[in-house]
Amino acid sequence: MDLRLEFFLLVDFAFYGAYYIGALILFILSSQKKKDIFNTWGYKKGIIYGLLISTIGALVMYPVINGAQPGQTEVFYGVLIALFIVGLGFSLQQTGANPFAVSLGDPKSGSSRLNLAGGVNSFGTTIGPLAVAFIIFGTLSGEGTPEFSKMQGLYIGVAALFILCAAVFYFSKSLPDGITNEPFEPANKAMYLLIALTVIMFICFGWVFYTYSIPEPTIEALKEDLEFKRLAALITSLIAVIGSIYYAYVKSSSNSRGWGALQYPQLALGMLAIFTYVGVEVTIQSNLGEVLKLVTDKLNNLNGLGLPALTDTGIAKYISLYWGGLMIGRWTGAISVFNPTEGLKKVLLIIVPYIAFGVIVLVNYGSYTWNEIIIFSVIVAIQIVGFFIAKDNAIATLKIFSVIGLIAMLVGLFTSGDIALFAFISGGLFCSIMWPCIFSLSITGLGKYTSQGSSFLVMMILGGAIIPPIQGKIADIFTIQSSYWVAVLCFAYLILYAYLTQKVLSKQIK
C-alpha cells in the first residue's frame, strides 16, 4: 500500500473533515429537537465542551502510540481516530469562539478581535514544529530517531492545556454566557442538502482511499489513467460542495422557507469563501515541502524552482516562516482592539509586523541567511502598505490581500529561485487576516441565525480536506510548480467574494 500519498489524504480528511462532521451533527440534532442546541448552551459553555472533547482526543493518543514502532499501519489509523476526535472538539470551539469574539464589543471591530485570537494560535503553529522536534528528538533540527514515549508525554501536555483553557472559561465571571432564547425555525431544506453532500463526498473519498489499498498498476498507461480517475473523484467532491452552496443560494432567494441561515446570501457566499480560504492556506504549505524536495534536475540535484533540493530538515525553516507569516498579519490586524490613538496606531502598524518577524527569526535562530531576511522584510513592507490602504475595513482588506495573494502565486508560477520560493511563502502572510474578515462579514445581519450560520461556516473548514489533495494530484500528473494554479483560482474567488458581499450588504443596509 502506498502510504505516502494516502497518509496526507487521510490526515487532512480526518482532521479537517471532523470540523464538517461535528458542525453537521450539531445542526442535524438541533433540527430534530427543533431548538438551536448551541444557543441553549451558550457560546461559553459550547467552547468548554469543545475543549473537553479535544482533551479526549489528545488522551486517546497515549494508548494508541504506547509501544508503537515507526511504520505500523494500525498505529497510523489509531492516530487518525484521535485526530478526528480532536477535530470534533475544535469544531465546537470554532462554532462558539468566532461569534463569541465578535459579540464581545463593537461588531465593526469584530474582525480585529478574531485577529487577536488567531495571532495567539499562529504563534503556536510557528513554534510548534520546533517544540515538537525538541521534545521528541532532543534537538531543534528534527534529526535523529523519534521516541514515541516522548510523544506520549507531549499529548498528555496538550490534554492538560485543553483542560486548563476549559477551566479558565468555566471559572471566569467576566465572560458572558452567550445564551440566547430566540425561537428556532427548522431548516429542513438545508439539512437534507448537506446530508446529500456528505454522501457524495464519502463516496468520492472512499473510492480514492480504496484505490490506495490495492496494488498499483505496473503498466504506465494504466497508472496514469488511475491518477486521472483519482483526480476526477476529488474534483467531483469539489463540484458537489460548490454546486450545493450555489443551489441553496438560488433557491433561498426565491423562497427562504426551510433554508434557515442559508437564506442570507452573505452567508452562502461566505461559506464558499471560508472553504476556499482554508483550502488555499493549507494547500500552499502542504505542497511547499514537495516543491523544495522533489528533484527535477538530477544532474545538478535541483528542484523545480531551480534551487538545491532540500531534505525534510532543510524545509522546516520555510514551513515555520509560512505559518509565521500568518502570525505577522494577525498580530498586525489585532492592533485596533487596543484602541490606540491614530498617531500611535500608524507607528504600531509599522513596528508590530517587524517585531513578529523578529520572533520568527529568533525561534529559528541561525536558520535564515541575510538575503532571506531582507527578501521577507520587503514582503512584510508590502503587507504594511496594504494595511494602511485598507484602514480596518473588512471588505477593503479582503480585496487588497486577495489581489496581492493572487499576484504572489503568479510570480511563483512564472519565476524561479528565491523569488519564486518567497512568492509562495508570502501566501501565508496575505492569507493571515482573511478568516476574521470573511467570518464577521458572513454573520452580519443574521440575528437569531447567527450560531447556525457560524456552524455552517465551520463546516466549510472542509476546504482543508479537499483542495490540498486536488493540488497534490495535479502535481502528480503534471508538475508540482504548475499545481499552484489551484491557489491562483482560490485567490480569484476571494476577490470575487469581496465584491459580491459588498453589494449584498449594501442592499440590506438600504
Task: Describe the predicted segments one by one.
Residues 109-137, 161-162, 453-468:
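Glycine-rich segments within core transmembrane alpha-helices of 12-TM secondary carriers
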Residues 132-141, 156-182, 192-216, 233-252, ...:
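C-terminal membrane-cytosol helix-exit motif in multi-pass small-molecule transporters
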Residues 9-36, 61, 320-332, 463-466:
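Central cavity-lining transmembrane alpha-helices of secondary-active solute carriers
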Residues 92-109, 288, 432-447:
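Intracellular juxtamembrane helix-capping segments at the cytosolic ends
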Residues 52-72, 356-369, 386-391, 403-416:
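C-terminal ends and interior cores of transmembrane alpha-helices
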Residues 70-93, 374-379, 419-434:
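Hydrophobic core of transmembrane alpha-helices in multi-pass small-molecule transporters
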Residues 199-233, 260-320, 324-329, 361-366:
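Extracytoplasmic gate region of multi-pass secondary transporters
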Residues 21-77:
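Conserved MFS/SLC helix-loop-helix module at the cytosolic interface between two early adjacent transmembrane helices
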